[in-house]
Regions:
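Core beta-strand elements of the Rossmann-like FAD/NAD(P) dinucleotide-binding domain
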Residues: 6-8, 153-162
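Conserved Rossmann-like nucleotide-cofactor binding loop
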Residues: 18, 41, 170
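Active-site-adjacent segment of FAD-dependent monooxygenases/related oxidoreductases
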Residues: 52-119
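Flavin (primarily FAD) binding-site architecture
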Residues: 165-177
Length: 177
């Protein structure tokens, strides 16, 4: 079977928070990328998000923080951590930090992640590949020149100047080096 082939500046494996944010930042600077995501679509699980101050700053720079739906976010200035039974262990008070990021932002499941993925699709149409599995790196001598993958079960070869492994703690990209 002939292997499909594409060329891009950056190939990113993993469309979680790190990979998707990187791809969006690159797209906003005119850098072409392809993001391979093993899942068949955006995350749907019940996974709430807490945006820490630095994460809020990143979303703000991407132009997304103020676009999160108001009904799906809440600012929290203080967290109390307690033992089972109620004894307080410690308190984290975000109001001691400088504004405007002197809070944590708690969201309904996947709100921030979906906002990032939606913005990425608009900024880089066709650059986010679901049902795409990394199968190996491509080398020219000792230099990485891209990757091999399957997309919807079909083999594909990606040539790129840079490959980023944003595929988590058990990274297949890292294992391939």
């Amino acid at each position: 079977m002939a292997r499909a082939s594409i060329e891009t500046d950056v190939a990113i494996v993993g469309a979680g928070g790190g990979g998707a944010v990187l791809a969006l930042m690159l797209a906003q600077q005119g850098v072409r990328s392809v993001v391979l995501e093993r899942a068949s679509g955006p995350p749907q699980g019940l996974r709430g998000e807490i945006l820490q101050p630095n994460g809020q700053r990143v979303l703000d720079r991407l132009g997304l923080l103020d676009k999160l739906p108001a009904h799906a976010v809440r600012s929290v200035h203080r967290f109390n951590f307690c033992r089972s039974g109620g004894e307080r262990l410690c308190t984290v008070d975000y109001s001691d930090l400088p504004a405007p990021y002197n809070r944590a932002v708690v969201t309904l499941p996947n709100v921030a992640h979906h906002a990032i993925l939606d913005a990425l699709e608009k900024q880089n149409p066709g650059g986010l590949w679901y049902d795409a599995t990394f199968t190996g790196l491509r080398f020219d001598g000792s230099r990485v020149v891209g990757l091999q993958a399957t997309r919807h079960g079909e083999p594909v070869e990606v040539s790129s100047r840079l490959v980023v492994g944003a595929d988590g703690a058990f990274s297949k990209v890292r294992e391939s080096l």
